[in-house]
């Protein structure tokens, strides 16, 4: 068995078993070489060493290598380039990697096919003296080891950042006037080379796992533009936009009056260009859509103005309702006052009419105020009551005291005493034909004369005069006879004297 002490010789150990070589263990992993996608940086390994080792591993020996034709060699060159990557169970972190596109290593295949030698040249690399030792050694070159490393790393599929989509920041689709600036920024970004990730080797087999800390840092930070790339032109200045966009012309005019002149904008100004600054795979942008923000602002302002107008309308309605209620209340009060005033006027008119009628009934009444007129009416009523009492006393009919007031009852009692004292002379006051002496006698006792009463006096013989006692005889008979002669006789007395005497039987 041959061992290579030099690490640069890349010797492989082979064990001969009945004329066929069998590998004892896999060769040690070669040092890592950075992966590049360009065809110029790819080293083309000698394909005859690779084919020879493959034939030895199949068990056909060196002699079997000459029996294959050129078509089989072309088919068996690098079949792993067209296979999908194999993802292990423990490589869940690498599950987001995608297979390589078919034309990804087209340049590598074309370079490899140019360096294919004839099959016979592969046998010259075998040691001519296999019997000098129990083991034969095949010395592949460094380029063959690099090809193996590329094959193993390509089969894993997780150690290389395959997509160039993640090597540049995410951009929004340009529209309208943004085509020129977007194309310039895309051209500047495409010149940035793809950064490869670090691949670490396992102990028992070659295994490629990306260091996600470095990969994420490469994704999160935007790539630095090359100094040779042309700087993108500055974005056009943003045209100022109005804060409110209303549908009607009147609302637009109102908003234009409220805004200062510096915030006024052109009628057909294009929308501002939104620059994309996202660097991750998620669709995120540093600057939001300003058109949507403006729409939200205008919508909020319209809602605020609409609510304010609604509040004003409600307040106006409330004020109008209060005015209507107050007007109705005031009109009701005025109508009630008018009715009250009319009734009071009618009542005063009736009172005045009655007072005028009372003034006409009271003689010699020259009072104007109501209190004086009422006093005159009271005195006149008292006089009338006294006259009625005197008339009742003269006719012999007495009114019950209960029907007269207290003053009239006291006066009646006083007159009764006077009548008892005067005797039949008290009745002569009601008869003027009795003579002035009787009237004077009545006046001496404090009785007013009959002429003072406005009521007429009717001469009539009282019913009680027949029961009166005869007058007393005069003190001198001669004078009494003369008085009798002078006294007129009643008209029936003469007829009675001339009447014939009635004969008695």
From Swiss-Prot:
<protein>
    <recommendedName>
        <fullName>Transcription factor APG</fullName>
    </recommendedName>
</protein>
<keyword id="KW-0341">Growth regulation</keyword>
<comment type="subunit">
    <text>Homodimer and heterodimer with ILI5 or ILI6.</text>
</comment>
<feature type="compositionally biased region" description="Low complexity">
    <location>
        <begin position="174"/>
        <end position="199"/>
    </location>
</feature>
<feature type="compositionally biased region" description="Basic residues">
    <location>
        <begin position="324"/>
        <end position="334"/>
    </location>
</feature>
<dbReference type="GO" id="GO:0009742">
    <property type="term" value="P:brassinosteroid mediated signaling pathway"/>
</dbReference>
<keyword id="KW-0804">Transcription</keyword>
<feature type="region of interest" description="Disordered">
    <location>
        <begin position="324"/>
        <end position="344"/>
    </location>
</feature>
<dbReference type="GO" id="GO:0046983">
    <property type="term" value="F:protein dimerization activity"/>
</dbReference>
<feature type="compositionally biased region" description="Polar residues">
    <location>
        <begin position="300"/>
        <end position="310"/>
    </location>
</feature>
<feature type="compositionally biased region" description="Polar residues">
    <location>
        <begin position="131"/>
        <end position="144"/>
    </location>
</feature>
<feature type="domain" description="bHLH">
    <location>
        <begin position="335"/>
        <end position="384"/>
    </location>
</feature>
<dbReference type="InterPro" id="IPR044273">
    <property type="entry name" value="PIF3-like"/>
</dbReference>
<dbReference type="GO" id="GO:0080113">
    <property type="term" value="P:regulation of seed growth"/>
</dbReference>
<dbReference type="GO" id="GO:0003700">
    <property type="term" value="F:DNA-binding transcription factor activity"/>
</dbReference>
<feature type="region of interest" description="Disordered">
    <location>
        <begin position="119"/>
        <end position="156"/>
    </location>
</feature>
<feature type="compositionally biased region" description="Basic and acidic residues">
    <location>
        <begin position="335"/>
        <end position="344"/>
    </location>
</feature>
<dbReference type="GO" id="GO:0005634">
    <property type="term" value="C:nucleus"/>
</dbReference>
<feature type="region of interest" description="Disordered">
    <location>
        <begin position="469"/>
        <end position="505"/>
    </location>
</feature>
<comment type="function">
    <text>Atypical bHLH transcription factor that acts as a negative regulator of grain size. Binds the transcription factor ILI6 and forms a heterodimer of antagonistic bHLH transcription factors that regulates grain length and weight by controlling cell elongation in lemma and palea. May be involved in the control of lamina inclination through brassinosteroid signaling pathway.</text>
</comment>
<keyword id="KW-0678">Repressor</keyword>
<dbReference type="InterPro" id="IPR036638">
    <property type="entry name" value="HLH_DNA-bd_sf"/>
</dbReference>
<feature type="compositionally biased region" description="Pro residues">
    <location>
        <begin position="222"/>
        <end position="239"/>
    </location>
</feature>
<feature type="compositionally biased region" description="Polar residues">
    <location>
        <begin position="200"/>
        <end position="212"/>
    </location>
</feature>
<keyword id="KW-0805">Transcription regulation</keyword>
<feature type="compositionally biased region" description="Pro residues">
    <location>
        <begin position="23"/>
        <end position="33"/>
    </location>
</feature>
<feature type="region of interest" description="Disordered">
    <location>
        <begin position="256"/>
        <end position="312"/>
    </location>
</feature>
<comment type="similarity">
    <text>Belongs to the bHLH protein family.</text>
</comment>
<feature type="region of interest" description="Disordered">
    <location>
        <begin position="1"/>
        <end position="40"/>
    </location>
</feature>
<feature type="region of interest" description="Disordered">
    <location>
        <begin position="61"/>
        <end position="99"/>
    </location>
</feature>
<feature type="compositionally biased region" description="Low complexity">
    <location>
        <begin position="492"/>
        <end position="505"/>
    </location>
</feature>
<dbReference type="InterPro" id="IPR047265">
    <property type="entry name" value="PIF1-like_bHLH"/>
</dbReference>
<keyword id="KW-1070">Brassinosteroid signaling pathway</keyword>
<dbReference type="Pfam" id="PF00010">
    <property type="entry name" value="HLH"/>
</dbReference>
<feature type="compositionally biased region" description="Basic and acidic residues">
    <location>
        <begin position="288"/>
        <end position="299"/>
    </location>
</feature>
<keyword id="KW-0539">Nucleus</keyword>
<dbReference type="InterPro" id="IPR011598">
    <property type="entry name" value="bHLH_dom"/>
</dbReference>
<feature type="region of interest" description="Disordered">
    <location>
        <begin position="169"/>
        <end position="242"/>
    </location>
</feature>
């Amino acid at each position: 068995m041959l061992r290579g002490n030099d690490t640069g010789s890349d010797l492989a150990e082979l064990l001969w078993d009945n004329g066929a070589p069998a590998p004892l263990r896999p060769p040690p992993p070669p040092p890592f070489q950075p992966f590049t996608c360009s065809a110029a940086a790819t080293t083309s390994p000698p394909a005859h060493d690779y084919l020879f080792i493959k034939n030895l591993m199949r068990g056909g020996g060196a002699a079997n290598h000459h029996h294959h034709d050129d078509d089989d060699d072309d088919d068996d060159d690098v079949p792993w380039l067209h296979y999908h990557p194999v993802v292990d169970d423990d490589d869940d972190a690498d599950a987001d990697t995608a297979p390589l596109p078919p034309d990804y290593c087209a340049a590598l295949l074309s370079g490899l096919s140019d360096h294919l030698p004839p099959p016979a040249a592969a046998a010259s690399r075998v040691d001519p003296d296999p019997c000098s030792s129990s083991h034969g050694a095949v010395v592949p070159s460094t380029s063959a080891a690099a090809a193996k490393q590329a094959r193993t790393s390509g089969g894993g599929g997780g150690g290389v950042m395959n997509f160039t989509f993640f090597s540049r920041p995410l951009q929004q689709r340009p529209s309208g006037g943004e085509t020129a600036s977007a194309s310039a920024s895309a051209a500047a970004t495409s010149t940035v080379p793809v950064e490869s990730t670090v691949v670490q080797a396992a102990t028992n087999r070659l295994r490629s796992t990306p260091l996600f800390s470095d990969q994420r840092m490469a994704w999160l930070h935007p790539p630095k533009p090359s100094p040779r790339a042309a700087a993108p032109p500055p974005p056009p200045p943003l045209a100022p936009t109005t804060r409110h966009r209303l549908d009607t012309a009147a609302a637009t005019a109102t908003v234009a009056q409220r805004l200062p002149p510096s915030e006024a904008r052109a009628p057909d100004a294009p929308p501002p260009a939104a620059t994309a600054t996202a660097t991750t795979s998620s669709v995120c942008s540093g600057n939001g859509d300003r058109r949507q923000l403006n729409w939200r602002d205008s919508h909020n302002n319209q809602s605020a103005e609409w609510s304010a107008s609604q509040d004003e309308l409600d307040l106006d309605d409330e004020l109008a309702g209060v005015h209507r209620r107050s007007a109705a209340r005031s009109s009701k009060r005025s109508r009630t006052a008018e009715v009250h005033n009319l009734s009071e006027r009618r009542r005063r008119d009736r009172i005045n009419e009655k007072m005028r009628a009372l003034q006409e009934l009271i003689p010699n009444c020259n009072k104007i105020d109501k209190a004086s007129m009422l006093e005159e009416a009271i005195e006149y009523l008292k006089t009338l009551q006294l006259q009625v009492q005197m008339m009742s006393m003269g006719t012999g009919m007495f009114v019950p005291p209960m029907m007269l007031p207290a003053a009239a009852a006291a006066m009646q009692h006083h007159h009764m005493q006077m009548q008892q004292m005067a005797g039949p002379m008290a009745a002569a006051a009601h008869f003027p034909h009795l003579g002035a002496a009787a009237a004077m006698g009545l006046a001496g006792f404090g009785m007013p004369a009959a002429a003072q009463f406005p009521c007429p006096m009717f001469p009539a013989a009282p019913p009680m005069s027949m029961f009166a006692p005869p007058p007393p005889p005069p003190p001198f008979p001669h004078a009494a006879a003369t008085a009798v002669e002078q006294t007129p006789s009643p008209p029936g007395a003469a007829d009675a004297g001339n009447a014939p005497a009635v004969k008695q039987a």
